[in-house]
């Protein structure tokens, strides 16, 4: 029989809905299901319910030891080759607690990060381009759960590529080839666009290009295998990759950046007159995350929000909220006729909006609570 996993509450949590469970700091709980970002647990009174996964931590030493072992096997520490992720039938100790229903421990597959990703929620995992993560769980909504550098969390699956059985050396070689491709032909190639930097950017590796806000650059290549990054040339001749959401295309698009075009104008977005929630002042339809960020930063106040169509899932939506320091984005899934955000379910989007005007949509570990105060105007 599988060993029961014990978790301990790191913070107090008060249930917001019937299917959730109140917990107290340092309370011991039994873990029943950890396949989502909210975990199902049982308390000493035999009551069960969902709690935020970042409010509890595992205290099961055998389970921790197994996780370390699985990670070592996957990374090949102390071995010439990595051990296959399929459990060895000759290892009954592993079989004794691998539960087929716990997807967290079923995968342990390496994947390589294609693009940088900054976590927006406390249960997400930040990604650094060029590093390797261990994929622990895959969900049908396009988000995967994995571990990197001792941290565990969710990230968008299209930011990584699976390398399965490829040895680490192959990946290093591919990075070398990628770098060589950037270095070669520095001063060749047609100018596709002239862009101006919206924000300063500091490179994290030799492939990328440093620039300051307002810098004008030529776009000379759009790598097909790296769609979020453009290859640009600065006026001093330096060439490298830049994140495309940090720049805007100049309107007149001169042939070279030696000209001095007028500063770019950001599009003014407004509530949508088409789409599922057309006519609602908070619905902005098909705008990008970047456009939402720009609008909230330019004319929003803390607590202002908008709802937009999801870029990654055609039938889903995102709530973008102006917050102190860093704006927040929350995914809303439409399952049949129900709108789901985390473990909470609402029959209409209007009901969801009204709920989070009264109840916090986000609570930090420090106790900071964020609400939907009013729609962006």
Swiss-Prot record:
Sites bearing Phosphoserine, chain numbering: 85, 89, 91, 96, 166
Keywords assigned: Acetylation, Cytoplasm, Endoplasmic reticulum, Nucleus, Phosphoprotein, Repeat, SH2 domain, SH3 domain, Translation regulation
Residues spanning the signal sequence: none
Sites of Phosphotyrosine modification: 105
UniProt-annotated location(s): Cytoplasm; Endoplasmic reticulum; Nucleus
PROSITE patterns: SH2, SH3
GO biological process, one term: negative regulation of insulin receptor signaling pathway
Start and end residues of each SH2 domain: 282-376
Any GO CC annotation of this UniProt entry: cytosol
Stored Pfam families: SH2, SH3_1
Residue intervals of the SH3 domain: 2-61, 106-165, 190-252
The keyword Repeat appears for this protein: yes
Function text: Adapter protein which associates with tyrosine-phosphorylated growth factor receptors, such as KDR and PDGFRB, or their cellular substrates. Maintains low levels of EIF2S1 phosphorylation by promoting its dephosphorylation by PP1. Plays a role in the DNA damage response, not in the detection of the damage by ATM/ATR, but for efficient activation of downstream effectors, such as that of CHEK2. Plays a role in ELK1-dependent transcriptional activation in response to activated Ras signaling. Modulates the activation of EIF2AK2/PKR by dsRNA.
Subunit structure: Interacts (via SH2 domain and SH3 domain 2) with EGFR. Interacts with PAK1 and SOS1. Interacts (via SH3 domains) with PKN2. Associates with BLNK, PLCG1, VAV1 and NCK1 in a B-cell antigen receptor-dependent fashion. Interacts with SOCS7. This interaction is required for nuclear import. Part of a complex containing PPP1R15B, PP1 and NCK1. Interacts with RALGPS1. Interacts with CAV2 (tyrosine phosphorylated form). Interacts with ADAM15. Interacts with FASLG. Directly interacts with RASA1. Interacts with isoform 4 of MINK1. Interacts with FLT1 (tyrosine phosphorylated).
Entry protein name: SH2/SH3 adapter protein NCK1
Species of provenance: Homo sapiens
């Amino acid at each position: 029989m599988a060993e029961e996993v014990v978790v301990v509450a790191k913070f107090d949590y008060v249930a917001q809905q019937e299917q959730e469970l109140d917990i107290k700091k340092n309370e011991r709980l039994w873990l029943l299901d950890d396949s989502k970002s909210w975990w199902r647990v049982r308390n000493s009174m035999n009551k069960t319910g969902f709690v935020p996964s970042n409010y509890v931590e595992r205290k099961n030493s055998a389970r921790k030891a197994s996780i370390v072992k699985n990670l070592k096997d996957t990374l090949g520490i102390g071995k010439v080759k990595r051990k296959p992720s399929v459990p060895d039938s000759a290892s009954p100790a592993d079989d004794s607690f691998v539960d087929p229903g716990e997807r967290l421990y079923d995968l342990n597959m390496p994947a390589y990060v294609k693009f940088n990703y900054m976590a927006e929620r406390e249960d997400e995992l930040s990604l650094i381009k060029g590093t390797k993560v261990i994929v622990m769980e895959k969900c049908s909504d396009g988000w995967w759960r994995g571990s990197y550098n001792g941290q565990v969390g969710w990230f968008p699956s299209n930011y990584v590529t699976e390398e399965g059985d490829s040895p680490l050396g192959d990946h290093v070689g591919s990075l070398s080839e990628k770098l060589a491709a950037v270095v070669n032909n520095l001063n060749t190639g047609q100018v596709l666009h002239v862009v101006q930097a919206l924000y300063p950017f500091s490179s994290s590796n030799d492939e990328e290009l440093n620039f300051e806000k307002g810098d004008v650059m030529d776009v000379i290549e759009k790598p097909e295998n790296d769609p979020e990054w453009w290859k640009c040339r600065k006026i001093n001749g330096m060439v490298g990759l830049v994140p495309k959401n940090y720049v805007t295309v100049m309107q007149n698009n001169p042939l070279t950046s030696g000209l001095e075009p007028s500063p770019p104008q950001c599009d003014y977005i407004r509530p949508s007159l088409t789409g599922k929630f057309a006519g609602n002042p908070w619905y902005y339809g098909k705008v990008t995350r970047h456009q939402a960020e720009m609008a909230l930063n330019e004319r929003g106040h803390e607590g202002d929000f908008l709802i937009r169509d999801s870029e990654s899932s055609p039938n889903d939506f995102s709530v973008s909220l102006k917050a102190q320091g860093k704006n927040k984005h929350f995914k809303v899934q439409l399952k049949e006729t129900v709108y789901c955000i985390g473990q909470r379910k609402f029959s209409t989007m209007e009901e969801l909006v009204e709920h989070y005007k009264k109840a916090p949509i986000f609570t930090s570990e420090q106790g900071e609570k964020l609400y939907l105060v009013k729609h962006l105007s």
